[in-house]
């Protein structure tokens, strides 16, 4: 077993003001594994979890040391925003599609919202698994403060059966 395989999944369970319990992950691998496991357990249409992490391209540039991440890596940097958008489209969403066993998902509902403090991308798609229709909503936020990225993943059933 390699050192990477032994990596402990960093996760916290928090309770929102609405009384909902949400798992908050600190690494992409644990987040994707959780979604895949919940899909296997048929809990795919009532899921809410979050991911707060430094994207792999940021860690690569800092030689895997969060202390060495450039202060310029934030929502005010065009280069950071461009690379983050590529990471979301080519890696994060692709990995989510694989985790929910729906590689054909297209995330047709796309939007981007920019303010001085942050940039938010919204992705949504209705799909079906085991004959149960549900909607996936993914929100990705980066702020002007640092390179930390916040992902909010929610699924809910669609229509009354």
From Swiss-Prot:
InterPro entries: RGI1, RGI1_sf
BP GO annotations: energy reserve metabolic process
Location in the cell: Cell membrane
Cross-linked residues, Glycyl lysine isopeptide (Lys-Gly) (interchain with G-Cter in ubiquitin): 68
Membrane topology annotation: Peripheral membrane protein
Pfam family, one: RGI1
Source superkingdom: Eukaryota
Induction: Up-regulated by a wide range of conditions, such as intracellular iron depletion, carbon source restriction, high temperature, high osmotic stress, cold stress, unfolded protein response, and high hydrostatic pressure. The promoter contains several binding sites for the stress response transcription factors MSN2, MSN4 and HSF1. Down-regulated when treated with different antifungal drugs from the azole class.
Alphabetized UniProt keyword annotations: Cell membrane, Isopeptide bond, Membrane, Ubl conjugation
CC terms in the record's Gene Ontology section: cell periphery; cytoplasm; nucleus; plasma membrane
Additional remark text: Present with 8450 molecules/cell in log phase SD medium.
Function noted in UniProt: Involved in the control of energetic metabolism and significantly contribute to cell fitness, especially under respiratory growth conditions.
UniProt similarity note: Belongs to the RGI1 family.
Protein's recorded name: Respiratory growth induced protein 1
Gene: RGI1
């Amino acid at each position: 077993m390699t050192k990477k395989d032994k990596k402990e999944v960093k996760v916290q369970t928090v309770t929102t003001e609405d009384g909902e319990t949400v798992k908050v992950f600190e690494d992409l691998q644990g987040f994707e594994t959780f979604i895949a496991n919940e899909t296997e357990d048929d809990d795919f249409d009532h899921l809410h979890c979050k991911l707060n992490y430094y994207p792999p391209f940021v860690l690569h540039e800092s030689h895997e040391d969060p202390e060495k991440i450039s202060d310029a890596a934030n929502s005010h940097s065009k280069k950071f925003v461009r690379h983050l958008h590529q990471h979301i489209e080519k890696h994060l969403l692709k990995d989510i599609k694989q985790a929910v066993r729906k590689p054909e998902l297209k995330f047709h509902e796309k939007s981007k919202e920019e303010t001085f403090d942050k940039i938010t991308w919204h992705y949504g798609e209705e799909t079906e698994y085991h004959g149960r229709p549900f909607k996936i909503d993914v929100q990705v936020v980066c702020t002007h403060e640092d390179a930390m990225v916040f992902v909010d993943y929610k699924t809910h059933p669609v229509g009354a059966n």
